[in-house]
Amino acid sequence: MIKLDVLRLLEEQGKTKYWLYKQLGMSYQNFSKMINNETKSIRYENIETICLLLNCTPNDLFLITDE
């Protein structure tokens, strides 16, 4: 299973979920689902924006697990 690992990146950079939520400008419901890996898809636009905000690559954003 592929999971979004953005919480680790935020922690490493000393940033909060609230900071990212405000930067993305999306609804809190959609943001919460995305952050908590409760969504089936993520728009490329959001992946790109997160990468730019956190100065990372898409490879840094995702984690592959055995679940």
What do the predicted segments below correspond to?
Residues 55-67:
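Short C-terminal boundary/hinge segments that cap the last helix of small helical domains
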Residues 30-33, 46, 60:
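Residue-level recognition of specific faces of alpha-helices
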Residues 39-49:
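Short, basic-rich loop-to-helix N-cap that marks the start of a DNA-contacting helix
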